[in-house]
Regions:
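Cytosolic catalytic headpieces and adjacent flexible linkers of membrane translocases
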Residues: 1-164, 168, 182, 194-196, ...
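Cytosolic ligand/metal-binding cores
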Residues: 185
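Membrane-embedded transport module
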Residues: 123-174, 178, 188, 193-301
Length: 301
């Protein structure tokens, strides 16, 4: 049986370690040595995956989780997964447009903090997943608002954080590429994945990014705000014109012995309004409406 995974998770199910060709107990001194070495690698931004084995008799049935116990730690693999070149400018552009960026990752605190430092994201306090497991919804909502970086998260942790942010009235977009991101992708208002993501992430996402550059996120935000602003213009113009027509006919009919406008006249007016509204989708939008997200407010009518 060969198992691989996050270092701490593998260490929890190992009782021995292969050292200089011999199998020795995984005692506290050895455990401390392993953790010191891997923490040094994490601080350098290297992700660490542990590998363990166990000899089991052959069987015809499936292997189960209970078999993952008393394993032998064979070693660990450290690899660098650098951020995309466009990550830093994309984060800066999103912040300038009023988008708050939060990092929800299954990586260790040290690796995640190192990557955030490289892309210029100020994270402050790092919250690991085990700290949010026993929090209530209100406590988690308050924590999610003030925290930028969550590390060592399970798929359910990510989903909970996205859900509480939505409950607080935020519009949440979640970008994920792995199978662990699928629950959060479904829970978000807008699930975003990339063309090279795993199948389950692409299926759970609402939008698939075909371009490699993350600057497409800023372009999408700006274009979406332009579309939303022009939709509001159309709704306000249509509602005000139709209300004016109907209200004037109702009031005039109450005091005049004749109809001030025939149905044909109303249809002609609507046609004229509709022709003028053809230009609204390509109308210019003010900078303040682009830089800050707008909300639909019926009172504006």
């Amino acid at each position: 049986l060969i198992c691989k995974g996050a270092l701490q998770e593998i260490l929890n199910v190992c009782s021995q370690v292969r050292y200089n060709g011999d199998i020795v107990p995984l005692d506290e001194p050895m455990l401390s040595r392993i953790q010191r070495v891997t923490e040094t690698q994490n601080r350098q931004g290297l992700r660490v995956v542990a590998v363990s084995t166990k000899y089991l008799p052959a069987r015809s049935g499936d292997y189960h989780r209970v078999d993952e116990s008393d394993l032998i730690l064979e070693g660990y693999i450290a690899f660098l997964d650098p951020p995309k070149e466009t990550t830093a400018p994309a984060l800066k552009a999103l912040k300038a447009n009023g988008v708050t960026v939060k990092i929800l990752t299954g990586d260790s605190e040290l690796v995640a903090a190192k990557v955030c430092l490289e892309v210029g994201l100020d994270v402050g306090e790092v919250v690991p997943g085990n700290q949010i497991e026993h929090l209530g919804e209100d406590e988690l909502a308050a924590l999610a608002k003030r925290t930028t970086l969550f590390a060592r998260l399970t798929p359910m942790h990510k989903e909970r954080i996205v859900t509480v942010l939505r409950r607080e009235g935020h519009v949440v977009g979640f970008l994920g590429v792995g199978s662990n991101d699928a629950p959060a992708l479904r829970a978000a208002d807008i699930g975003i994945s990339v063309d090279g993501a795993v199948d389950i992430a692409r299926e759970a996402a609402d939008i698939i990014l075909l371009e490699k550059s993350l600057m497409v996120l800023e372009e999408g935000v700006i274009e979406g705000r332009k579309t939303f602003a022009n939709m509001l213009k159309y709704i306000k113009m249509t509602a005000s014109s139709n209300f004016g027509n109907v209200f004037s006919v109702l009031v005039a009919s109450a005091f005049l012995p004749f109809l001030p406008m025939l149905p044909l006249h109303l249809l002609i007016q609507n046609l004229l309004y509709d022709v003028s509204q053809v230009a609204i989708p390509v109308d210019n939008v003010d900078d303040e409406q682009i830089r800050q997200p707008q909300r639909w407010n019926p009172a504006d009518l």
